[in-house]
Every structure is written in structure tokens, then in C-alpha cells.
Amino acid sequence: MVLLLNPLENLKTYISNRPPLVIFMVSVSAVAIAFLTIGYFFKIKEIKSPEMTEDWNTFLLRFNEIDFCISENETLKHGLNESITPESTVTSSQTRSSTQSPPLLEDPGPINISVAITLTLDPLRPFGGYSRNITHLYASVLGQQVGLAGREAHEEMNITFTLPVAWNSDECVLHGRCEQMVFSTCMTVTAASNVFPVTMQPPHCVPETYSNATSWYKIFTTARDSDTKYTQEYNPFWCYKGAIGKVYHTLNPKLTVIVPDDDRSLINLHLMHTSYFLFVMVITMFCYAVIKGRPGKVRQNNPDFCQEKVALSAG
């Protein structure tokens, strides 16, 4: 009865005599709190799906690492009231790739996907601009330049930027030098279907409606990925008399693949049940410590029994 009337004393005795169990109780309590917090986090937050390693956000962000060089020495291609069609964007490079390895029967061939993206053109000082109205920029890159691996690393992607307004040397003459230009362009990527992510696509743009010029000039550009800047292939005079183009993609939360609500609810339920079980375990041990905290008295050995045991051993 005395022990039952002194719960605080029992608890102190339990803590002082059983430190391993106390540490175990504290550890279990910490794990239970962690599970409870993680479960609540899964309930209120949208979590990116770990099963989908690449979506359109990550795919377009890789183009931010590419430098495009618009050089004065490039040849202009002239067109009259012509639009960028799937046939016009397919170049001889795709013909070369088809001759190297026979296409699979299931391969539908190159496809076009057009998305709106920001393009900056930063002319270097020797660059004087173009007297013609440039409305289209064209480039060709490999999959490895945008971070693709495996078979997709050797796939060629043809990129066409359709400018909303013509780009020429009028601004250069007006300011005495060419200033940086920022365009909201329509970027058309032509490549094999396996290059593109299989997740929800961003809103598409229509290249034919992006530029209202009756006649246009397409200029071919060269591309360089960011890794080249740190290798022996780096050329400090690359694009010396030209303009460097950079692509900037703004993250679109709608393109990120998230864990479905049903899965998040199931995860939250499992974590809650686990934390409740651990809390019940800790509470049970705590109640035991309060009710019966003092260890039982150690039974003392009988001296006569010890002497008899010694005598038997000596005999």
C-alpha cells in the first residue's frame, strides 16, 4: 500500500535503477513523435512522386544549361510566309541517324512538341547584328547535352525558336551597340518520342501564330553544354563575334508528378497507427514505473548453506 501511495517516489526509483529502460522509453517516444509529424506532413503537403524521376519541369530545366551561339558567319535561310511544319524541321541529321541503325517497326519517328519559353540573346561587343529580320533560330543538340542517359543520350534533337518579333540590327544602330534582348519564344523540339517525358505535357504554343512577319529568316546556331566549360574542349573564343542565347524555363507546379491523395492518406494512416502503438507502449511502461517502481529486495544467502557448500566442495 505504501508503494501505491508514492507514485512520484516510485518513478524516481524506477529511473535511478533502470536507466536502460528509461533510455528505451525516451527513444520510443521520439520515434512515435517523428512518425506522427511525418504522417501529418504527408496529409497536408503535396509530395513529389519518387517513382517518376523525370517530368517536363526537369526536362525543360536542362535546356537552361545550354548556350546557343548566333554567329555573324552563319548562313541565313530565307522563306516567304512559311511556317515551321513537322516536315520542315526534319533535317539531314535525322536521315543520317536512320541510315546508321534501322528503325524499329514500332517507332513512329520524330515528333514535334512546341512549348513557350523565355530566350535571352546577349550580343558580344564585336557583334553588329543582322540587317535582315531574323524570326527563327535553329539548333541541333544531342541528348547527352541536356543530361539524358542511356540510348537517349545519342538521340539528336532539333530545336527551332520562333521569335514573336523580328530581330535585326536597328536597335544596334540606335544605341551604338547591340543590347541584350529578351523574347517569349515558341520552342519547337523535334526528336524521337522516347526522348520526351511521359508525364503531363506543358501548354503547347503554335509557331505559325507566334510571328506575324510575311517573310522570315532562319539562322542556324551552334550549342554548347555547361560541362564543356570545364573540359579541355573549352574554347575561350567560342562565339567571339556573335550573340549567346540562353533559355529560361519557369517551374510549373502542375507539371510535377505528385503522390496521389489516396496514397498519401494511406501513408498517413499507417504512420498514425504505428505512432499510436508506440505511444501505448510508452504509457504502459510509464504506468508500471509509477505503480511498481522499486525493485524487489535481493534475497540474502544463508550463511549455514554457504558453509555447507564450502565443506562439500572441500570434501
Swiss-Prot record:
Task: Look up keyword Transmembrane and say if it applies.
Answer: yes
* Pfam short name (any one): TMEM219
Keyword Zinc assigned to the entry: answer is no
InterPro entries from the UniProt entry: TMEM248/TMEM219, TMEM248/TMEM219_dom
What family does this chain come from, according to its entry? Belongs to the TMEM248 family.
Q: Which gene encodes it?
A: tmem248
Q: Where is this region: Disordered?
A: 81-107
Q: Name one GO cellular component term.
A: membrane
Topology relative to the lipid bilayer, per the entry, is: Multi-pass membrane protein
**Bias regions of kind Low complexity — which residues?**
88-101
| Residue ranges of the TM segments | 22-42, 271-291
The protein's location, in the record's own words, is: Membrane
The alphabetized UniProt keywords are: Membrane, Transmembrane, Transmembrane helix
Q: What is this protein called?
A: Transmembrane protein 248
